[in-house]
Design a protein with these regions (language model features):
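Conserved thiamine diphosphate
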Residues: 1-46
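Thiamine diphosphate
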Residues: 2-12, 46-49, 61-227
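General beta-strand structural signal in soluble alpha/beta enzymes
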Residues: 27-31, 54-56, 147
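A broad, low-amplitude sensor of folded, mature protein cores
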Residues: 33, 42, 49-60
Length: 227
């Protein structure tokens, strides 16, 4: 989601996820060079052939933190369906997929936020129930939020929400997954830089700093018209 013109902004990830069933395709949203490398290598060496769809926004390629060490390419390194963080005293867990991670991480560093963990879902389909389930179970007392840039009726939200809720049921957790992102819209992007940037900042502020009451209040999504 690049926030430019309506048809220049989104790869329509929600449409690919709509087609995903019965392990028919693989849908990835890689956030590191090593993740991209291992995804391609895994595809070559697998003993079966199924379509691999990878989303790679241009702005992610230019981000200074989008790097991987040599060790992440060599030895026993491999593709990780999710990328977790080792953060102590976590009170809030943010789940996201794709380039929004870097904006959230930059905002977290700038504001010295120490209690929020960001978990990246690198493989959206087949959904990583096992690895993500372990994260959910280990943080059962934390606030849990899904963050995306896309409007609420687009992006991965419609696909992931029922699957994350399934994990709550599986582990018998009295939990809810809360949404932070843009409100439902007919077009993927406003096409007006000022509105886009203001909404982008609101998404970061609400997801990382706002109390849970405000997160719940904004559950319909951030409006394109707030600027």
């Amino acid at each position: 989601h690049e926030g430019m013109g309506p048809e220049h902004s989104s790869a329509r990830i929600e449409r690919f996820l709509q087609m995903a069933a019965e392990d028919n395709i693989q849908i990835l949203n890689c956030t590191t060079p090593a993740s991209y490398f291992h995804a391609l290598r895994r595809q070559i060496h697998r003993n079966f052939r199924k379509p691999l769809i990878i989303f790679t926004p241009k702005s992610t390629l230019r981000h200074p933190n989008n790097t991987s060490s040599i060790d992440e390419f060599t030895g026993k390194s491999s593709f990780h369906r999710i990328i977790d963080e080792d953060i102590k005293k976590t009170t809030r867990v943010i789940f996201c997929s794709g380039k929004i991670f870097y904006e959230l991480d930059d905002y977290r560093r700038e504001n010295k936020i120490k209690n929020v963990k960001i978990v990246r879902i690198e493989q959206l389909y087949p959904f990583p129930f096992d690895t993500l389930g372990q994260v959910v179970f280990n943080h059962k007392d934390c606030e849990m939020i899904w963050v995306q840039e896309e409007p609420k009726n687009m992006g991965p939200w419609g696909f992931v929400k029922s699957r994350i809720r399934h994990l709550f049921t599986k582990y018998k957790l009295d939990q809810k997954i809360h949404y932070v992102g843009r409100k439902r819209a007919a077009a993927p992007a406003t096409g007006i830089a000022k509105r886009h940037n203001t909404n982008q900042t609101l998404i970061k502020q609400i997801s990382l700093q706002a109390p849970l009451k405000r997160v719940i209040k904004e559950r319909v999504g951030v409006s394109f018209m707030k600027f």
